[in-house]
């Protein structure tokens, strides 16, 4: 296959049921566009990699990076972008919550602006939205609050710095890739923070859809990793997310132990 004009990187973990659906949707959306799809799977126990391999047998556009002993969405995205053959790389989740049709709008913006570095799919622009059942109301409000905090602390100029849906010029990404954290889930916020004001950004609003199959990867650990990223960025990357998480867990353990000891002494 000739050099593609677009690479799509899709990190996966336990998304076997969604592979056929996202492949079909991308095939329909990107018809007539020379593209490749790079799945980066963190050794999913549900057989996601095996499902992807079935499609590889009959489709030269599909590639798989099967990671063993390495975990984390950020690291998966970084590896996928490094492996991409195209100059433009789209990043999206496999859970079908991102609107693949917006990839065409992103491509159009790049074609009109050769100096453009990044296009972000945003849930929070005037024409962006979150489906009623995609988030609980509490999570939606929490997401908006965290977004405001992240933008303020890290001085990020984007309506949705926590988006997992974006398209980037590979050359622009590689300029700061050595300084990006492989731990965690919010690679875009890390990239925006490390790039500062040196990149040209545009946004495309989209509707964040409901997850149909599989389970959300959002957890308390995800939130801890996000705040660890913020602390790491404040410290200019001198301390890794992994070490900050270790400290947070360690301190919480000490706090619990002191609390229990205090209660025992009181009672």
Predicted regions: what is each one?
Residues 3-4, 59, 84-87:
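Active-site acidic short loop of glycosyltransferases
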Residues 1-28:
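N-proximal low-complexity "stem/linker" segments adjacent to membrane-targeting elements
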Residues 65-83, 88, 100-185, 211-221:
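Acceptor/aglycone-binding surface of glycosyltransferases and processive sugar-polymer synthases
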Residues 1-5, 148, 155-156, 179-266:
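Hydrophobic helical membrane-anchoring modules
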Residues 41-50, 96:
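A conserved acidic beta->alpha catalytic loop
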Residues 17-21, 46-54:
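Acidic helix N-cap motif at the loop->helix transition within catalytic regions
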Residues 34-44, 65-66:
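Short beta-strand/loop segment that forms part of the nucleotide-sugar
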